[in-house]
């Protein structure tokens, strides 16, 4: 786990967990994850799940995406999605509130790869530069994404060539995030 993205993601995950502890909630909680199997689940009450990010051993990959669209993904994208299991984590980047997308389980990883593949196919059809989403904001047509060509983290308008660079790379983006605690 020496890759800068893996280290920055682990560091942010630790800050996220600490933010939950500091508010007296213990582990992060979610009603959306009830009944789902994952190595990061601490407790499933039937009404809500408590969870914590854990290192993924062995590290996963996104080979299904790369084979499916015949493209080599930027190493930062692979490291972002393959180094840990975690629920999505709420954060702020400057004034932008977002949910940092994560892989919750092996099954969730398969679903994620299908979604990424669909996203890349649509971009290819629209003749847009390839990106992979890593975060969602409160907007139906914008996502936080990694540009596959440059590794920059961008605020992207889906289906259009409208992109604002947020950070030069994923590690620096993650280092600038501030955890947000949202109660279920």
Curated annotation (Swiss-Prot):
Q: Which InterPro entries match?
A: Syd, Syd_sf
The answer to whether keyword Membrane applies is yes
Q: What is its main location?
A: membrane
Keywords for this entry?
Answer: Cell inner membrane, Cell membrane, Membrane
* Lipid metabolism recorded as keyword: no
Compartments where found? Cell inner membrane
Give an example GO cellular component term for this record.
cytoplasmic side of plasma membrane
Q: Which domain of life is it from?
A: Bacteria
Q: How does it sit in the membrane?
A: Peripheral membrane protein
- Among the Pfam families in the record, one is Syd
Task performed by this protein: Interacts with the SecY protein in vivo. May bind preferentially to an uncomplexed state of SecY, thus functioning either as a chelating agent for excess SecY in the cell or as a regulatory factor that negatively controls the translocase function.
* Family (UniProt): Belongs to the Syd family.
- Kindly provide the name given to this protein in its UniProt entry: Protein Syd
Q: Which organism is it from?
A: Photobacterium profundum (strain SS9)
Corresponding gene?
syd
